[in-house]
Structure formats: structure tokens, C-alpha cells
Amino acid sequence: FWNYRNNKYQVNVIDTPGHVDFTVEVNRSLRVLDGLVFLFSAVDGVEPQSETNWRLADNYAVPRIGFVNKMDRSGADFLKVVGQVKSMLGSEAVALQLPIGAEDTFTGVVDLINNRGIIWNEHDKGMTFTEVPIPEDMLEEVAEYRERLLEAVAGYDESLMEKFFEDPNSLTEREILNALRAAVLDNSIVPMVCGSSFKNKGVQTMLDLVMELLPSPMDSEGVKGTHPDTGAELLRKPDVNEPFAALGFIRAYSGKLDAGSYVLNTRSGNKERISRIFQMHANKQNPIPFIEAGDIGAVVGFKDIKTGDTLCDPKHPVILESMEFADPVIQLAIEPKTKAGQEKMGIALS
């Protein structure tokens, strides 16, 4: 949960591995995500696997924010990475911040939207920050990159273009954020921010921008599927009053699923009873009575289910778009010799 402007938001986070061997895990996650925070190293910039994962995100048209991490490391260069995201990934990457210092002198950022400096406090390990004037030696650079930001936003929203040419500083924070959000949802602009997750610097401002710019499940017009018998196209809207539809792990796209209820697996044609539902937090399982449109949860009770299966209300069957995976380079199965070893193997693998 994250508190932002007196509102409490529930954020379902799926952390995907960055190594090439686990590209399939990224693909599985992108299929059910509404928005994405794409991590880059401030030292290494855009890497080959970054390009692969970016293309996967493009395939699913997932709106995204770029977070340039490791600003405290030797060789960190935020603007170099922003340039690489533009040139190598072909995106309209726009800096929303400029770092105050770099490497061992990285202390904060300049917020280009609000024209303010932010310094994270060392005494509480970055849990809080202090607003400060923009350093004098950065004023010229800040003015240049703020104008680039406002020009990009005004270029997307024609209603702001005239106002931008008359007086760029007349654009309000809300006007900038609203236009920027629309551009992000349209995948026309990729906002770029920076920080050091190890030192807890920049994470808070990044999460605030997630609330402002990335889509809520309720922003979706709905998910398209097909009727398993007739092949007719169906649209399921993110509404708890719609018939239930989900993909197993599970991501709910419409309706509401109660523990103890039955769902139809449209691949197998079997009905499955959902005995229990959990909200996952790392390796902790918190029992919950139901999930509804937009939620992600884990369920117990399946007898026959595969990744990409569609689960739905038996009275309103639908097949959602599944997932396509590349053939594995090598196949290997691990299984316990005895039932007693099953729990031990689970602990070892986790």
C-alpha cells in the first residue's frame, strides 16, 4: 500500500528477473500488468537484455516509467542513460528529474515539474526528504531540461501548445501531470527518473509518479476475449458487477471471485472449486475472502491448470488472450523422490 495525497493505494508488484535465461518470466508478467517501472543501471545503461524486455513490453503495449538506479555508483550518468533509451530503444524518453550530484556525492534530485530541489535525509536512511532551492550551478541546466519537458508535454496536448509558446511557466503542475499521464497511457512518452534503491533515495518520488502517471486497472476499457463455443468476441470491463474472468496465478480482469466458489477453466472445460484465496506479500500468504477486478492473488484448489489458462464464471464463458513462449533451449525436471521430500524441495527452491 502507498499513501499519496491523502489517498491510500493498493499496488500489486511483480518483480521479474533481468537475466536472459528468465525472459519467459518477464513475458508471463507483462501479459497481466497494467503499468511498468523499467529499471536501468546508471552505470551500464541500456543492456542487450534491456532491449529484449523493452520489445516484450511493446508487444503488450504496457505504459511505463524509466527508473535509472545506482546513481550512487562510480560512473553513474543519468542523462547518458536517458539518451540511450531514446536512441537505442526508439522511445520518447523525457527526464522529469535531474540528479543533484552523482556517485558518492549523489544526495537528491531536482523536480523539473515543480522546479524544486529534493534532498534525502541521511539520519533516517532516506525515509524522509527536505525541499531545498535548486543549486545555483544547476540553474541553467534545469531551465534547459524543464523546457524540453514542457515542450514534449505541450507537443502531445495541443490545448497546452499556445499556452506554452506564450509563457512556458504558466503551465500548472496539474496541467503538466494530466497531459503527461495521457501521453504515458498512449505510450507516446516515457518519463525518466533516477535514484539509488540501495540507499532508499528516489524510491518515494518514483512511487508518487506511479500513482500519478501509470494506469489503474479501472482505467482499462476492458479485456477482449472470445466465446469458447461460438467464437464471438466478448469484452469484459473492470467492474465487480461483470461476470468473473481471470488468468491463473491469478489476475482478475472483471467481476468478483469468492473463496469457496466455482470457476470454469475454458481450456480443459472443467469446473474448479476455489477453496482459498491469498494476497501474496513476498513469501507471506495472507488469507482474503475474495478478489475483484484489478486484483492479483493466489488461489488454492486447482486440480488441472496451466499458465495462461482463462478462469471465468461458468454461466458466462470467455477465453482471454493466452501467452506464447519460445521453445526452451534445454529441458530439465526436478521432482522429490518421496512425498516427505516435497516440502523440503519447496523450501530449497524458494
Describe each PLM feature range.
Residues 1-350:
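Structural and coupling elements of P-loop NTPases
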